[in-house]
Amino acid sequence: MDLIESIRALAALAFTLGLIGLAAWALRKYGPDSIGRAIAARQDRRLKVIESLALDPTRRLVVVSLDGEERLVLLGDGRLLDWTPKGPPPASALSPSPVAEPEPVV
């Protein structure tokens, strides 16, 4: 291998490493996170994930905001397991049912 071929091989190696470094820099600067933020900033989205909590490897609690209302959703095994309904809970869940007064016996 003479001197010219060695210089050519080193130049090709430097060029390849430079391209890899350029790709890493571009992914950091313009990667999926920044693209997602740019799209979200351009659009007023109706559905937003506020917070997510992994309960175990298969189940996850997610707080989502839909049209300004927050809902709690339980996800697991690739399907919806439970969700909080719209509106306040029924009155029976808040207070015990009224007990009928006993009638006097004559």
Swiss-Prot record:
GO CC annotation terms, alphabetical: bacterial-type flagellum basal body; plasma membrane
Keyword match Membrane: yes
Topology within the bilayer: Single-pass membrane protein
Family statement drawn from the similarity comment of this UniProt entry: Belongs to the FliO/MopB family.
Region of interest: Disordered: 84-106
Subcellular location: Cell membrane; Bacterial flagellum basal body
BP GO annotations: archaeal or bacterial-type flagellum-dependent cell motility; bacterial-type flagellum organization; chemotaxis
Xref: InterPro entries: Flagellar_biosynth_FliO (IPR022781), FliO/MopB (IPR052205)
Superkingdom field: Bacteria
UniProt keyword terms in alphabetical order: Bacterial flagellum, Cell membrane, Chemotaxis, Flagellar rotation, Membrane, Transmembrane, Transmembrane helix
Transmembrane stretches, start-end: 9-27
Protein name as catalogued: Uncharacterized protein CC_0952
Signal peptide: none
